[in-house]
């Protein structure tokens, strides 16, 4: 089967599940219902509303919405609600771009960042590699308030590129938005195009992800879940524009945050990840379907870190819960989003919420995510070790 036709078949499988068919036989429908009931119990406590999507490599077994949009919008959420993905951008967008560029022999994981980005200057930075950036072991600080320190995108990027290292590369794990911003520039230098344009052409359109993008248009606003009252930067309720302040300073476009998407679109993406080695995997990858496994395998850099390349893997007190396999991989987003995939069980778990509405002080999502993951794993009837 030709790659394009193979993916059409995959997309039709998605459409079938979206039409409201009963769950696939390998999922216990009663247990899936318990996932939805649990999420309903968390409405107006952990979040105003949520969308959950569960499935395997070729079908969606559960797609449900609970709750409402927010304080000033009592309309019920729907499965087509658009969410600010926050740091899911790092894996859905930035990491996927890196996978494609490695596949095309345009990006070397162990090459110094300076090979691609000479502007990345400072003591010790010549030793920072692409792998360091992807594993959050570059030595860069976690964050700095670019939205306060600079007035333009260009000035913000220059400040990131010249930020001193805190530690020797590879010596410490520290989750770093700054590292992701540097890696965004690497992708843009290689592709000679802005990352939003590259991802739209190279990833989202080929996968049929029609509601995944940066800078959502005004006409989408009523479908977008509101996030937070921004008291630090823009001084208004944020809806339809990126929640992350630094991404706001960068014009709404960055590899560390900025993407908006829906449950059905992310399910399409998850199915592509779980389909590696099948004809549909070649929709994006030319020669190396094993690259997804490489990027989603724990790197042990530095020793003891749970990080894969871009992705995270299960660890103690992880948002993945306690029942996914050791080969699972996933990520979370500050706004209340998460995605976990378990290739051993042929399973994906997507949870999208706007838990920061109206304030980020609500952290109950930290208990909701692992409980949802455990409930979903319990619903898989053909359990594998």
What are these regions (language model features)?
Residues 68-70, 123-328:
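Short, surface-exposed loop or secondary-structure junction motifs
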Residues 1-4:
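Positively charged n-region of N-terminal signal peptides that target proteins for export
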Residues 356-368:
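A short acidic/glycine-rich loop-to-helix N-cap element
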């Amino acid at each position: 089967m030709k790659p394009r036709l193979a993916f059409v078949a995959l997309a039709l499988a998605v459409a079938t599940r979206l039409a409201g068919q009963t769950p696939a036989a390998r999922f216990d429908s009663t247990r899936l219902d318990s996932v939805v009931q649990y999420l309903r119990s968390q409405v107006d406590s952990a979040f105003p509303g949520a969308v959950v999507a569960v499935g395997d490599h070729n079908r969606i077994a559960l797609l449900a919405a609970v709750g409402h949009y927010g304080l000033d919008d009592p309309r019920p959420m729907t499965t087509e609600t658009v969410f600010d993905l926050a740091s899911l951008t790092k894996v859905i967008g930035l990491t996927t771009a890196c996978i494609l560029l490695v596949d095309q022999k345009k990006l070397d994981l162990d090459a110094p960042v300076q090979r691609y980005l000479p502007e990345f200057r400072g003591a010790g930075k010549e030793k920072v590699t692409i792998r360091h950036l992807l594993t959050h072991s570059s030595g860069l600080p976690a964050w700095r308030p670019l939205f306060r320190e600079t007035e333009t995108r260009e000035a913000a990027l220059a400040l990131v590129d010249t930020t001193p290292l805190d530690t020797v590369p590879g010596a410490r794990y520290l989750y770093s938005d700054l590292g992701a911003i540097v890696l965004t520039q690497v992708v843009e230098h290689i592709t000679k195009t802005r990352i939003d344009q590259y991802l739209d052409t190279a990833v989202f359109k080929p996968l049929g992800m029609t509601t995944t993008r940066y800078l959502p248009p005004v006409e989408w606003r009523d479908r977008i879940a509101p996030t937070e009252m921004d008291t630090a930067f823009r001084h208004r309720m944020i809806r339809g524009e990126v929640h992350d302040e630094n991404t706001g300073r960068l014009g709404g476009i960055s590899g560390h945050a900025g993407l908006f998407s829906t449950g059905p679109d992310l399910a399409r993406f998850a199915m592509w990840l779980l389909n590696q080695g099948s004809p549909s995997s070649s929709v994006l990858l030319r020669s190396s379907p094993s690259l997804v496994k490489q990027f989603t395998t724990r790197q042990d850099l530095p020793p003891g870190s749970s990080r894969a390349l871009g992705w995270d893997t299960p660890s103690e007190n992880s948002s993945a819960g306690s029942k996914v396999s050791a080969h699972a991989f996933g990520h979370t987003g500050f706004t209340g989003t998460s995605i976990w995939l378990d290739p051993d069980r042929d399973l994906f778990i997507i949870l999208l919420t706007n838990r920061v509405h109206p304030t980020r002080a609500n952290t109950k999502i930290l208990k909701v995510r692992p409980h949802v993951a455990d409930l979903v794993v319990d619903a898989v009837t053909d359990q594998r070790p």
